[in-house]
Amino acid sequence: MDFIDEVKLYLKAGDGGDGCASFRREKFVEFGGPNGGNGGKGGDIIFISDANLNTLLNFRCRRHIKASSGKSGTSRDRSGTAGKDIILKVPVGTQIIDEESEEVIVDLDKPDMEFQVVQGGKGGLGNTNFKSSTNRAPRHFTHGQPGEERNIVLKLKVLSDVGIIGMPNVGKSKFLTRCSNSDTKVGDYEFTTIRPHLGVAKVDYSEIVIADIPGIIADAHLGVGLGHKFLKHIERCKILLHLIDVTHDEIISAYNCTHNELKLYNSDLVEKEEIVVLNKCDLLEETEILEKKNHLANYLDREVLCLSIDDDLQPILRLLNEKVKTKEINVYDPFKM
């Protein structure tokens, strides 16, 4: 399935129906009064966040969306039928942005959130509404109001428990494929992953959602490589799993390349809890691995893990699961001052 995380849409709510100017016409009723009905309200366009969706693919060929207009009122005080609302489902984590002002209208970051982006026009008034003691037979009615219209941008920022980060070709896709049911493409060349992939890893009796973020290169914060197309997805991850190719000549430089790009893009990203793993350890001798591991651990002043292609992933997944659960517990503390 294609992954689409940004689309531009033109939205037009339905116009209100016109009011009606009519009079009662019956046998033996010489002076029937006004009985024109009101116009129906135009349809709204409403967005709802759906936890079962993970891409904006539904909008690929649907860039102009218009709700139906209300029907005009008729005689016998019958109001016109209201226009039908349009309900649009988007993935959780979708931001709705005004294209002109670039203002975030709403951030649908929780399941089942509902937001009306454009409102349908009010229906016009029939001539019954203008009857008075001085005007017993009004012929005046009003037209329906036009529905709101707006150009918007939908931007999806993937919601996941763990985000796998690192330079291109460090084994991120392979890790996700091994620990989940993801069908991520794997290859021995840079930018095998050109869009975020999501996978669900089972850890004992629970599950965690893991996102494979495309490789980060120097100047990614300026848009180099795949740039902003994927850096934004890291903002919603609870934990970062930083994979580094152990065969890299300069381990610290390899770490800093990714770390610095995150900091330059959004300084808050480097405040996220990070687990650092040296990957592809089956390609080097144990003594060389230990030397690089200790060198990086001393530089970071924290533990660095090692991973080979044949290693059991459950220990790392359990560690990630524990960290994720801690984040969930600490999301909101109403008693914390």
UniProtKB/Swiss-Prot annotation:
EC number, as in UniProt: 3.6.5.-
Cofactor(s), names only, from the UniProt record: Mg(2+)
Residue span(s) of domain Obg: 1-159
Descriptive protein name: GTPase Obg
EC class (word): hydrolase
Subunit structure: Monomer.
Stored PROSITE patterns: G_OBG, OBG
UniProt record similarity statement: Belongs to the TRAFAC class OBG-HflX-like GTPase superfamily. OBG GTPase family.
GO CC annotations, alphabetized: cytoplasm
Keywords carried by this UniProt record: Cytoplasm, GTP-binding, Hydrolase, Magnesium, Metal-binding, Nucleotide-binding
Ligand binding (Mg(2+)): S173, T193
Binding site for GTP: 166-173, 191-195, 212-215, 279-282, 310-312
Pfam families hit by this protein: GTP1_OBG (PF01018), MMR_HSR1 (PF01926)
Function description: An essential GTPase which binds GTP, GDP and possibly (p)ppGpp with moderate affinity, with high nucleotide exchange rates and a fairly low GTP hydrolysis rate. Plays a role in control of the cell cycle, stress response, ribosome biogenesis and in those bacteria that undergo differentiation, in morphogenesis control.
CDD domains, per database record: Obg (cd01898)
Species annotation: Wolbachia pipientis subsp. Culex pipiens (strain wPip)
Gene Ontology terms: biological process: ribosome biogenesis
Residue intervals of the OBG-type G domain: 160-329
Upper taxonomic lineage: Bacteria, Pseudomonadati, Pseudomonadota, Alphaproteobacteria, Rickettsiales
Gene: obg
Matching InterPro entries: G_OBG, GTP-bd, GTP-bd_Obg/CgtA, GTP1_OBG_dom, GTP1_OBG_dom_sf, OBG_GTPase, P-loop_NTPase
Location within or outside the cell: Cytoplasm
GO molecular function, one term: GTP binding
